[in-house]
Every structure is written in structure tokens, then in C-alpha cells.
Amino acid sequence: MNTSAPLQNVPNATLLNMPPLHGGNSTSLQEGLRDFIHTATLVTCTFLLAIIFCLGSYGNFIVFLSFFDPSFRKFRTNFDFMILNLSFCDLFICGVTAPMFTFVLFFSSASSIPDSFCFTFHLTSSGFVIMSLKMVAVIALHRLRMVMGKQPNCTASFSCILLLTLLLWATSFTLATLATLRTNKSHLCLPMSSLMDGEGKAILSLYVVDFTFCVAVVSVSYIMIAQTLRKNAQVKKCPPVITVDASRPQPFMGASVKGNGDPIQCTMPALYRNQNYNKLQHSQTHGYTKNINQMPIPSASRLQLVSAINFSTAKDSKAVVTCVVIVLSVLVCCLPLGISLVQMVLSDNGSFILYQFELFGFTLIFFKSGLNPFIYSRNSAGLRRKVLWCLRYTGLGFLCCKQKTRLRAMGKGNLEINRNKSSHHETNSAYMLSPKPQRKFVDQACGPSHSKESAASPKVSAGHQPCGQSSSTPINTRIEPYYSIYNSSPSQQESGPANLPPVNSFGFASSYIAMHYYTTNDLMQEYDSTSAKQIPIPSV
């Protein structure tokens, strides 16, 4: 690999602005330092491009094929079509454009590269890069609109989403085609590197404005989402104080009722506005006003509510961390290329450092396309676990050692059954993230299990219906382990507190507040007086 010969023919690659050294070998020292820097840049970019080709192609291919799986044949929302387009753009960048860029790195002189290859590389890299950024910006605006509570009652139709997608494709590749056609014959086979004068500089300026606008939209949107989610988590930890008449104890379930019979609307953060929370609150408070003399809910259901609230708060914190990761990845991967493009617009003369910065910037922007499926996809957690599993066993293979695992039987029964239970709990992310319930509270909430312990105690509290759920399975394991902002939009079957089955039509927020303010033993005994056996009340 000859690193000095191509750079000498590059019009944008001049010598480093180094102070002159005493002696006749100052030029040789400069050339040696320049060759060392360029070699280090090539090694770093090649290593990152290998990671992009392997991990990025795998992740985007899995995400792209998931939309054509029979179980996901119908999109959850129309906006999922944007995720499909994003995965296609990133798959093309990681699988086709990144190997082409690797070829360009080792043959920097355009004299050794066919013109058709340079034209294809210019068009695909410029078009798909800006298209991927526009898709990410549109998804960020959609999620910000959803979190801020400005999502309309009816989602956008598929025709509107399709028109928006076609508009983004048209604008992106029109700009890329103009930039490719206006490229002068150069010794560099890099996009935007030859647009140095006349109309080429105007097209480069337009490309820089579009690139900068997309990066700014993504960064600002996810910063605002993170702030909203952080405030939402703080509100959940510190519930509002409501003045209650102590002379007349309020019922534990349902919303508090004013003198004129209207239920008090509990204020919630903006995250739940125009979502299923308001529907749940309205239906439950309305049901309470009609059925105020119903049976009080048992203590096990109150424990389930507390677990759901803690689970939702944990998801808020996890969503904040994800927003921070998205902002950092966008800034780190997009700023080097943006700085090099701005420098090309402002100055007519390039430099050797600018050329290295441009190479590293294109590598990082391709690396961002490799990271997208592990951040934006619906099954991003599963992809990350598989990659970590592969890296762990690859490292163990290099160290020539095996990881010894011992299977310990869980309770009584067949070893094969316990092995299946153990593997199910280790791979079920909802079980790992949800709070671990006690066995007796699960039996009290869902009826007797099929274990031997429950068979030995045939007495069951009155009012409980058996649901046939094993005691080893947690409550509500179908809760999705990630927040709705991780997906393109909230599903029609929302997860979290709104997805819990209402018991005797009680209000969610008022039950949560009542758990904090009505904890006296006399009141609890009055609520559980209908049970045949007193159920111990957990500390909240």
C-alpha cells in the first residue's frame, strides 16, 4: 500500500503547516509524519468499516426482514413505514456503500478507479446518507410530538406517510444527483470533495444546510424528550397532595367525587395526554359513579398497582438514558463530516488535515447507520443481547477457555421442566425488568397455582377467581419492556399502567394517591372485611 504517492496527487492535500526545522532533512521529517498520520487514519477507518459491514448489515437486515414476517404482516401504525425506509437506507449503506468506501481508501487516486465506480459511489453515498438523516429527523419530530401530548386522535393515513416518504426520497436524491453531475474531474474519488467553484460550491452549500438542519432537529428533539421524561419520573415519585375530609373516609377505589357529583380529574404529566391514560381514567371514574357500592378491591390488586407504577418509573429513567445515547451518537458521528464540509465551503484551499478529517467523517457517518438498528428498532434490545452474546463467546474463544455453567434445579419436579423455566426467565426481558412478586401474593391475586404447595392449602379467599397461571410466571409478563418512544409510535395496545386490567372499575391515579394517604389499620381492615382470611398489607 503506497500512502505517499496518492496524497501527492491530491489537490486538497497539501503539506502540514509545520515550523521549519534546522537541517536539510526537514522535508523528509514532514513527509514521514504525514505518512504516519495517513496510515493511522486508514487503519482506524478500515477497522470501523469492518464493524459497520458486519454488525450494521446484520442488524439492518434483521429489522428489514421483520416487517415481512407473517407475524408482523400488518404494521402496528402507519408511521412504522418510516422505520422500514430507514432500515433499507442503512442496510444499503452498510452492505454496499461501506465496502465501496473501503476500496476508495486504498486507491485514493482516481486514475486507478473507473469513472462509473466513482459516479455510483458519489450518488449512493451522498443520497443515502442525507436520506437516512432525514428519516431520523422525521422520526424524532414524531416522537417529540407524541411525548409532548400533541398527537391527534386519528393518526396519519398511509397515503400521507407514503407521500412524505416519496418527498424525502425525491429531495435527497435530487440534491445528490446535482452534486454528482457538477463534480469536476479530480484525483479524489470522494463525494463533495470536488465541488470547489461555481455552481458546485452552491450545491455544496445547500447540502451543508440540509445536513446541519437534520442534525440540529434530531439533537434538539431528543433533548426535549429527555427533559419531559425526567419531569414525568419526578412527578411519579412525588404525587400531588390532595386534601381529604377525615370525618368521612373515602372509598379506596375510584376517583374522588365533588359535591356536585363530578369526578376530580387528576393532573398527569404531558406524556400521557391524548393517550390511553385519559381513556382509562374517564371510563373508570364514570364506572365508579354508577357502581359506588361495589365490593372493595383486595390488597393483592393494590400490590399489583404499586408494582406497575414502579415499573413505569423505571421505564421513564431508561428512556432518558436512551435519549442521551441518541444525542451523543448523532453529535459524535455527524460533527466531523459537518465540520469538514463547512470548511470546504468557507475556504478554497484544502489541507492534508482536512482530507484526513473528511475520511474519518465519512467513516463515522457510515458507523451511525450501523448503530441505527440497535437504537431505533422495535427489537433493539434483542439485537444488542445477541451481539453481546457473540462478542462474549468470541472473546472466550480467543482466550481458549470455556464458560462452565451449572444447572441448579429450582424447587421440586422434573429436571427438564425446571430447565425450561430457567431459560424462559433468563430470556424474557419483561420478567427481568418487572418487579419480582411474592408467591403468596400471586396466588391471592390469580387464584391457586398448580404447584404442590398450593394444593396443600385448599382454602382460597372469597372473591378471587383462579386464572390458571403458574406461580413461577410473573404478573403481566406481556408488558413490553421498553417505552413507546423506542418504537415509531405508541401501539394500539399500550403497555404499562394503562394496560393493566381494571378491577371493579377504580381510578388509576386516585388509587395510587389513596395508597399513600389511607394506610391506617382500621381502614384497611374495613376494606378487607369481606375476605374469609385477612390478607397482610405490604408496606408502600
Curated annotation (Swiss-Prot):
GO terms for cellular component: plasma membrane. InterPro entries: GPCR_Rhodpsn (IPR000276), GPCR_Rhodpsn_7TM (IPR017452). It is a multi-pass membrane protein. One of its GO terms (molecular function) is G protein-coupled receptor activity. Pfam families: 7tm_1. Keywords: Cell membrane, G-protein coupled receptor, Glycoprotein, Membrane, Receptor, Transducer, Transmembrane, Transmembrane helix. Glycans are attached at N2, N25, N184. The keyword Endoplasmic reticulum does not apply. Residues 68-86, 142-160, 227-318, 372-540 are cytoplasmic. The chain crosses the membrane at residues 47-67, 87-107, 121-141, 161-181, 206-226, 319-339, 351-371. Highly expressed in brain and heart. Also detected in skeletal muscle, liver and kidney. Also expressed by islet cells (at protein level). Residues 1-46, 108-120, 182-205, 340-350 are extracellular. It is found in: Cell membrane. GO terms for biological process: chemokine-mediated signaling pathway; G protein-coupled receptor signaling pathway. Residues 443-475 are annotated as: Disordered. Its main location: membrane. G protein-coupled receptor that is activated by the chemokine CCL5/RANTES. Probably coupled to heterotrimeric Gq proteins, it stimulates inositol trisphosphate production and calcium mobilization upon activation. Together with CCL5/RANTES, may play a role in neuron survival through activation of a downstream signaling pathway involving the PI3, Akt and MAP kinases. CCL5/RANTES may also regulate insulin secretion by pancreatic islet cells through activation of this receptor. Belongs to the G-protein coupled receptor 1 family. This is Probable G-protein coupled receptor 75.
